[in-house]
């Protein structure tokens, strides 16, 4: 039976009032998480991976909280731009926490960490996502920078992949989309050699948009945010969709690859990489 119009209107109003209360709480910085910090102010949503003692490496809980925060910020009409960063001055994010290595994690209906869901969400939210790169962006952290729509880096920032050193790999956007961003040859170099790159080198290869002195990082990020907020949000949302269109096909291999990685994590080769990392020795893969 169809609900009366008065009842439907009451439901709509209750939902609207609830959404206003949530938005108001976040505006005052009241959104609480364990592994991240989330704050909305003057149209800017700031999401901070808050595990500085682990160089802002993520675990399953971190990913779930990031997904929740991006969902809130992405569909909050008061938000026009999202900034992703890491707590402290040492690291933006250094990828998966090898101290936990939750290859067997099965939450949210996934096999392994819900990274595919997080990566897709960062692309799907109709707001520009800016990476505020304040330090090391290594491994999965480097992938997050690559997926962000824009990236502004401190001159102290360091970039690179580490997956093959520890028996890990990102077979989706972390490799396939990286090749679109920096070029095929450079992407292969990044993954095959696991070298580290300076902020200026990252700028030259197109991984970041701008490099500034560390003390000026927040000023520059705020400047970009304010410029974005002055523009048509609908036009920007459409432009983001258009920019994503050509690389959305990567989702297919990402979905399959992320699930297949679970099998790799259970192999002796991958386990040797993790063991060597924890024991601070050179892995013996062969």
PLM regions and their residue ranges:
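Conserved CoA-thioester-binding segment of acyl-CoA-metabolizing enzymes
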Residues: 15-16, 21-85, 120
């Amino acid at each position: 039976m169809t609900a009366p119009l008065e009842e439907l209107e009451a439901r709509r109003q209750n939902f609207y009032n609830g959404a206003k209360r949530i938005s108001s709480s976040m505006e005052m910085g009241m959104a609480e998480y364990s592994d991240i910090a989330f704050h909305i102010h003057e149209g800017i949503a700031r999401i901070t991976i808050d595990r500085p003692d682990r160089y802002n490496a993520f675990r399953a809980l971190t990913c779930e909280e990031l997904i929740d925060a991006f969902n809130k910020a992405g569909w909050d009409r008061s938000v026009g731009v999202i900034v992703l960063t890491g707590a402290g001055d040492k690291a933006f994010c250094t990828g998966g926490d090898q101290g936990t290595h939750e290859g067997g994690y099965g939450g949210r209906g996934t096999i392994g960490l819900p990274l595919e869901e997080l990566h897709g969400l960062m692309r799907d939210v109709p707001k520009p996502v800016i990476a505020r790169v304040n330090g090391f962006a290594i491994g999965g952290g480097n992938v997050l920078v690559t997926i962000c729509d824009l990236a502004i880096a401190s001159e102290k920032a360091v970039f690179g992949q580490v997956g093959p050193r520890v028996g890990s790999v990102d077979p989706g956007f972390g490799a396939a989309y990286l090749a679109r961003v920096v070029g095929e040859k450079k992407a292969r170099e990044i993954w095959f050699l696991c070298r580290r790159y300076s902020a200026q080198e990252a700028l030259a290869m197109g991984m970041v948009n701008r490099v500034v002195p560390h003390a000026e990082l927040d000023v520059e990020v705020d400047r970009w945010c304010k410029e974005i907020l002055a523009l048509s949000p609908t036009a920007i949302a459409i432009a983001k969709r258009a920019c994503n269109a050509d690389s959305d096909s990567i989702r297919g291999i990402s979905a399959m690859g992320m699930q297949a990685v679970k099998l790799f994590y259970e192999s002796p080769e991958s386990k040797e990489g993790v063991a060597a990392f924890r024991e601070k020795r050179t892995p013996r893969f062969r």
